[in-house]
A protein has these predicted regions:
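Non-heme di-metal
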Residues: 2-250
């Protein structure tokens, strides 16, 4: 299966955006990097480095099933809402790249469900997401009036959190789940590069930048609410104390 590659070695080949003609925004300052810095500044203001012990202990089987269930739910919803964007994505380059991402998210859902099946869970029918997760993933992510607003929310803020989370949490995972996420992480990194390309090419006016920044900030706030909801859920299930550091869900 042919994939798109932006830089460095990888499985994605034949970048459809590598045309000789310059496109709008190609020579613009790297607003993407500014947005990354903005998110990291906000994150550093609320995270307590003394609570990093969350990442230094193995998951219990119960918590692992809960975490994998969340990830499967997230990946399935991402496949569905990104697929829903395609009919209203006027930019041909973004359309091609987002269509590739839909397939990736579907495969990630399958990988998570396989890991759950090895633990006796074959369906999410009896698993209910927290209200904060539904507001964040089911309501907010599918919204956005333009491609750059949608990509700023999910492929920037969301995928940045996911990449960081998976790398940090990986040592806590059993070997079979590590192998699954070793397949997922490069895709998440590609999705960030996809987002950067779209933002650089199509976020070109001051109004564009203002709308993108607003989406980034609101997504960050919903992500934080989602993490707190995860802690409350773990405490309610007797898996962890309410004061434990929350995982970077996504």
């Amino acid at each position: 299966m042919t994939r798109t590659v932006f830089d460095g070695p990888g499985t994605r080949a034949a970048d459809p955006l590598a045309a000789n003609q310059p496109a709008a925004g190609d020579d613009a300052p790297d607003y993407w990097a500014e947005l990354i810095d903005h998110i990291e500044t906000r994150r550093s203001a609320i995270e307590d480095p003394d609570q990093a012990n969350f990442f230094n202990r193995p998951f219990s089987e119960h918590e692992l099933v809960e975490w994998l269930s969340f990830q499967a739910y997230y990946e399935l919803r991402a496949c569905q809402f990104i697929g829903g964007w395609l009919a209203t994505t006027p930019e041909p380059d973004a359309l091609i790249l987002l269509a590739q991402q839909v397939e990736d998210e579907a495969l990630h859902y399958e990988y998570c469900m396989r890991a759950l099946a090895r633990r006796g869970v074959t369906s999410l029918d009896d698993w209910t997401p927290e209200p904060e997760w539904e507001e964040w993933i089911d309501v907010w992510y599918p919204s956005g009036d333009t491609t750059i607003e949608r990509v700023a929310a999910h492929n920037l803020t969301g995928e940045l959190g996911a990449c960081q989370a998976f790398v940090q949490i990986r040592p806590r995972l059993p070997e079979d789940v590590q192998k699954a996420f070793d397949r997922i992480i490069p895709d998440e990194q590609f999705h960030m590069k996809l987002g950067r390309r779209v933002i650089q090419r199509h976020c070109v006016t001051e109004d564009d930048r203002a709308s993108v920044l607003a989406r980034v900030d609101r997504t960050f706030e919903l992500e934080q609410a989602g993490r707190l909801a995860y802690n409350r859920r773990m405490a309610r299930l007797g898996i962890a104390d309410l004061g434990d550091t929350s995982p970077l869900l996504s």
